[in-house]
Design a protein with these regions (language model features):
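C-terminal secondary-structure termini that scaffold catalytic or DNA-interacting sites
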Residues: 1-13, 17-20, 196-208
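Conserved tyrosine-mediated DNA breakage-rejoining catalytic core shared by Y-recombinases
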Residues: 2, 23, 60-98, 182
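C-terminal catalytic core of Y-nucleophile DNA break-rejoin enzymes
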Residues: 15, 81-101, 109-129
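Basic, Lys/Arg- and aromatic-enriched nucleic-acid-binding interface segment
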Residues: 23-55
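Short, basic (Lys/Arg/His-rich) helix/loop patches that form interaction surfaces
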Residues: 34-38, 109-111, 125-167
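A short, glycine-centered helix-capping/turn motif at helix boundaries
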Residues: 47-60, 158-160, 171
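Short alpha-helical segment immediately N-terminal to, or the first helix within
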Residues: 47-48, 154-155, 168, 180
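Catalytic-site neighborhood detector that most strongly recognizes the C-terminal catalytic loop/helix
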Residues: 77-81, 169, 173-194
Length: 208
């Protein structure tokens, strides 16, 4: 694997900075999004956090992409695979579906084809602005890509099978998805906690 590929398949930069938002930062980001006056920006931030989709994939979503009955959103993978069009369905909580339906008037004849009309760079800046208002410090994690990585880690921590996370994120190779195991390490923390366990009183020498 080349150096660039290794860096792309890591949750840290060569300088040791993490590329993903933490669970606390994710919750603060969503809370800041809920306070936005611009409701369409709120739903945009929400869809990024709850699907882990790429920002360009979110901008391609239409009213037909949202399936309220099944509570899923159908996302077209923008990374081509042999010229085939790949659509992946990602489940959403019912309250997110309701929010999308209400804000974008999905049941109305006046519903625009595209859910959002931002440019990619404009959407990137808007998301960064919401992160700043959420008190998330600048860095490689405070980006739309950081939200994508944060989704993967949140899914791993929630016990979602790796193959399902691969499907939801649109990874062609499972090896790409396994990077999220780097940030969990539940078993490692368990072993470490045993090392950190303080000695009992009958072992500690008082020196008297």
């Amino acid at each position: 694997m080349s150096r660039n590929n290794h860096q792309n398949h890591s949750l840290y930069t060569p300088q040791g900075q993490r590329k993903y938002i933490s669970q606390d930062e994710r919750q603060r980001f969503l809370a800041a999004a809920r306070q936005l006056v611009r409701q369409e920006l709120m739903t945009f931030c929400t869809i990024l956090a709850y699907t882990g989709c790429r920002i360009s994939e979110a901008l391609e979503l239409t009213s037909a992409s949202v399936q309220p009955t099944n509570a899923v959103v159908a996302i077209r993978c923008l990374k081509k695979r042999g010229g085939r069009t790949i659509i992946r369905e990602v489940p959403l909580p019912q309250y997110v579906i309701t929010s999308l339906t209400d804000v974008h008037k999905l049941h109305s004849a006046d519903c625009p084809p595209r859910l959002w009309h931002y440019s990619r760079s404009g959407a990137w800046r808007l998301v960064k602005r919401v992160m700043k208002s959420a008190g998330i410090r600048p860095g490689p994690h405070a980006t739309p890509k950081g939200l994508r990585h944060g989704f993967g880690i949140h899914a791993i921590c929630s016990g979602v099978p790796l193959t399902l996370i691969q499907k939801w994120l649109g990874h062609s190779k499972l090896s790409t998805t396994t990077i999220y195991l780097q940030a969990v390490g539940t078993e490692e923390r368990l072993f470490a906690s045993r090392m950190w366990k303080p000695p009992t009183n009958d072992v500690i020498s008082t020196g008297t």
